[in-house]
Amino acid sequence: MASATAPAAAVPTLASPLGQLRHLAEELRLLLPRVRVGEAQETTEEFNREMFWRRLNEAAVTVSREATTLTTVFSQLPLPSAQETQKFCEQVHAAIKAFIAVYYLLPKDQGITLRKLVRGATLDIVDGMAQLMEVLSITPTQSPENNELISYNSVWVACQQMPHIPRDNKAAALLMLTKNVDFVKDAHEEMERAVEECDPYSGLLNDTEENNSDNHNDEDDVLGFPSNQDLYWSEDDQELIIPCLALVRASKACLKKIRILVAENGKKDQVAQLDDIVDISDEISPSVDDLALSIYPPMCHLTVRINSAKLVSVLKKALEITKASHVTPQPEDSWIPLLINAIDHCMNRIKELTQSELEL
């Protein structure tokens, strides 16, 4: 006769505390691709900017608090029990998901540039928390204190940055334009310094020479170190660098002028035009970098010509978009033809100096 007593339900076995942390780190990392491609939540309600930022800041405070709690309990012995760890992990996971949910409330019509900044901050927080879980999952006796502090600090810093994120698309555009100006300024200064010293690899090679002073040149050749003829510019190279530097200076001037126009004339409600200006301006710095890298010896003049042409194309497109936008009133656009003439002059000179490369 079969027993009338039903078998007792099996009680799920919890993973070890450290195992739970490792699992949570994996779960958090799975959220990253979704945040990168996730769309804004559709709603018929009017967007309340003040409420959104208040909720986002509150969510960041909650994440920071959970990071503090977890770091405290797992940085010392004895470790919490499996049941206690489960509760801690659930709280961390809930705090992260709540933060992501608030990010999804930011609609696209508030500006793509602004949304990219908030998305980047969200990714920093999620990734920082995942790093913290991974470090804490190492037993405290094997985990250096500074590693734990660094990982926790990355979460904390990301959360602390939330109140400083621009609140509208104009402010976001100005932040991105300022970064682009700084990038191009750094590239230009590096190029000028290399030209003034006539020794483009001085910083790198000085260290190499000190560490390998007893080695023979033949050994360097075998190991792939450049020979002397590859380390310095020829007279033709130096002549070609002059218009390249001028072109990079024009790029810096272009970005600075665009930033000034956005600051003085940009309207917060013209989000699409501001996004277009930022999008094309974002292409200037990488194009400058490509040109800057191509002038280092051994220099290929054809590559310099190609990279210069790419940069010129981007600059003219940026000027065209800026001129057609609301940030450039009609009386204030006289600088654009002057800058285009300067850009064309640089490119024409580069073409003259590299024409022989095309005829080979």
Curated annotation (Swiss-Prot):
Keyword Zinc: no
Region ranges (Required for interaction with CCND1): 2-208
Nucleus keyword on record: yes
Region named Interaction with TCF3: 2-184, 150-360
Start and end residues of each stretch annotated as Interaction with RPLP0: 2-190, 240-360
Domain of life: Eukaryota
Keywords: Acetylation, Cell cycle, Cytoplasm, Nucleus, Phosphoprotein
Cellular compartments annotated: Cytoplasm; Nucleus
One CC-aspect GO term: nucleus
Modification comment: Phosphorylated.
Gene3D superfamilies in alphabetical order: I/LWEQ domain, Talin, central domain
Entry-annotated residues carrying N-acetylalanine: 2
Function in brief: May negatively regulate cell cycle progression. May act at least in part via inhibition of the cyclin-D1/CDK4 complex, thereby preventing phosphorylation of RB1 and blocking E2F-dependent transcription.
Family: Belongs to the CCNDBP1 family.
Oligomeric and partner information: Interacts with CCND1 and GRAP2. May also interact with COPS5, RPLP0, SIRT6, SYF2 and TCF3.
Protein's UniProt name: Cyclin-D1-binding protein 1
Taxonomic source organism: Pongo abelii
